């Protein structure tokens, strides 16, 4: 029987069988995505709740997270009048987490992972999408 995981300290077993905490998304920066002109959202470990009035940008916040996770981008998400939308996520990485599958995928694609991993998605008004992680451009599918 497996023990339940604490939502504030998600863990996985590395190759040597020891547990390590997961990298966690600490900051999301959003520019020109839907109704959001420019926003920075600082997240904390555990549960973060996003609330607001109709039209405040809650859906665009969820869309920004989906872009960071490699979802297909839609040109209609770009703010009217803007050339492109940009979403940047900062993941906090603890020492010794390089064995995590997502971090290995970024390193295998040429990205650099240190105490934080910066992931960026740019979506043009024409629908083209570019992804970068760890300072290196890479295929969007690497983020998935």
Question: Where are each of the predicted segments found?
Answer:
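N-terminal acidic, proline/glycine-rich, low-complexity intrinsically disordered segments
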Residues: 1-15
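Gly/Lys-enriched N-terminal cap/neck module of very large, oligomeric protein machines
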Residues: 19-144
